[in-house]
Amino acid sequence: MSGNTLGTLFTVTTFGESHGPAIGCVIDGCPPGMALNEADIQFELDRRKPGTSRHVTQRQEEDKVEILSGVFEGQTTGAPIALLIRNTDQRSKDYGNIADTFRPGHADYTYWQKYGIRDYRGGGRSSARLTAPTVAAGAVAKKWLREKFGTEIHGYMAALGEIDVPFVDWAHVRENPFFAPNAQIVPQLETYMDALRKDGDSIGARINVVASGVPVGLGEPLFDRLDADIAHAMMGINAVKGVEIGAGFASIAQRGSVHGDELTPEGFVGNHAGGVLGGISTGQDVTVSIAIKPTSSIRTPRRSIDKAGQPVVVETFGRHDPCVGIRATPIAESMLALVLIDHALRHRAQCGDVAVSTPKIAASAP
C-alpha cells in the first residue's frame, strides 16, 4: 500500500491501524535547532482526541504522544522525528458482524477489491483514527511556522448539517466541543446532535480554516501550486468530499470586477482569491473551506452485499462519531500547516536569495 507520505522537503509518513497496537508518523526534513517537546504536540492532540463530549465517539483514548527520535536535549536535530501514539481502548469485537460485509459509504468494498485483504476492525487503515498522527505532525509544522514567520492557523465549524454557524468571535471556538465561533448557537447544535444520535444516523459538516501571516511567494506553478497542494492534502482527510479556496464556488456568480482583488499602495482590497494568485501566496490570509460527508458507520439498517455478492442488511454497532466534522477542525488546521511548511522550505531552497524592488503591500488596505 503506497500513498502514505505527504510533502516534498518536509515529509510526513503515517503508519498504523485503528485497532492495532499503535499509530504514528515519521517526519523527515524538519529544520534543526527548534525547541520541541511532547507537550508542544500533546496540546494539539488533546483538541482532536475522542471521548471529549457526548457528541463524539466514546472511545477513550489518551492519545499520549511519544517522541522516539529526532529531538536531543529539547531541540530538533534535523534527523527524522518519529512520533508514536499507542492505542489503548480498542473493542474489536464490535466489528465481528461486518467481517464479511461492506458498509455503504465506507472504504470496506474498495479496500477489499483493491488489496484482497481488509482489516475490518474499526476500518483499519481507512479509519479517522489515523488523523491523530497528522495532527501530531501538524503541531510541529505549526510551531516552526509561528516562530519563523509569525504564521497562525485557526479553524472553526461553519455549518453542521443544515445549520449554518455564523462567525462571531475566535474566542468562542475553544469554549465548546463543536469548535463553533458562536456561543449562542451551541445549544441548538447540542439538541440537533442528541436527536441525530437517538435516530442512529449521522450528518456532515463544513469547516473553515484561516492561515494568517503567510509570507508572499509560497507555491510552485504549474502543478505544485499552493492551492493545488492544499486541496490535495485536505482531500486526504477522511470523509472530505469538497474543498474551496477563497470564494470557491461562489466565484461562479461573481463578475471579474468583483472577484479580482484590487491592489493599492496601502494593500489589497478584498481577498476573494483566498491568499493565492497563480498558485503562489500573496501574503494575505490563506482561506480554506472543506465539506465533510456524514459518517458511514451508523445503526440505521442499510442494504449492501457480502463477500459472495449476496444481498445483506448492515447495521453498524460500536463507538462512532455521528459527525466526524465535530473533531475535524484541528485536523484541517494541521493539514494546512503541513502544506505551508513544505512550501516554505521549498521556496527557501530555490528562491531564498531573490529580491525585487517592488515593496510587499499589506494583506488588506485600511
From Swiss-Prot:
Cofactor requirement: FMNH2
Cofactor comment text: Reduced FMN (FMNH(2)).
Reaction equation(s) it catalyzes: 5-O-(1-carboxyvinyl)-3-phosphoshikimate = chorismate + phosphate
Chain sites annotated for binding NADP(+): 48, 54
Record GO terms (molecular function): chorismate synthase activity; FMN binding
PROSITE patterns reported in the protein's UniProt record: CHORISMATE_SYNTHASE_1, CHORISMATE_SYNTHASE_2, CHORISMATE_SYNTHASE_3
Keyword match Transmembrane: no
Main function: This reaction introduces a second double bond into the aromatic ring system.
PANTHER family linked to this entry: CHORISMATE SYNTHASE
Protein name as catalogued: Chorismate synthase
